[in-house]
């Protein structure tokens, strides 16, 4: 069985503030540890049509999230989710990673 890691550097720009578990240092530490495993397949997120988001989320929700990313500083999207200017690219790459993973499994690449 092959295992893939689908990732980009955008995740380190998703800032959530001190004390929050989603930290760039954590992502970097995990990535560095995984790079030691030579049997993993590394890939980048897929590009995708943004309309695909509306197949799994309400259109109003998708539009609200797209408009919510701050130009500076941190912002609560809801009671649990903190976003920053870098969160937009990180979210796009997260969706692209899921799409790449599904495609890779379907095509038996991993």
Locate predicted features.
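HDAC/HDAC-like amidohydrolase catalytic core signature
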Residues: 1-110
């Amino acid at each position: 069985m092959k295992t893939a890691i689908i990732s980009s550097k955008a995740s380190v720009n998703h800032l959530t503030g001190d004390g929050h578990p989603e930290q760039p240092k954590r992502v970097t530490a995990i990535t560095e540890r995984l790079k030691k495993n030579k049997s993993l397949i590394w890939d980048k997120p897929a590009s995708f049509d943004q309309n695909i988001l509306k197949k799994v989320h309400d259109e109003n929700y998708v539009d609200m999230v797209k408009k919510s990313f701050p130009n500076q500083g941190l912002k609560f999207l809801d009671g649990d989710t903190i976003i920053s200017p870098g969160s937009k690219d990180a979210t796009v790459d997260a969706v692209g990673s899921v799409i790449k993973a599904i495609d890779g499994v379907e095509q038996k690449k991993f």
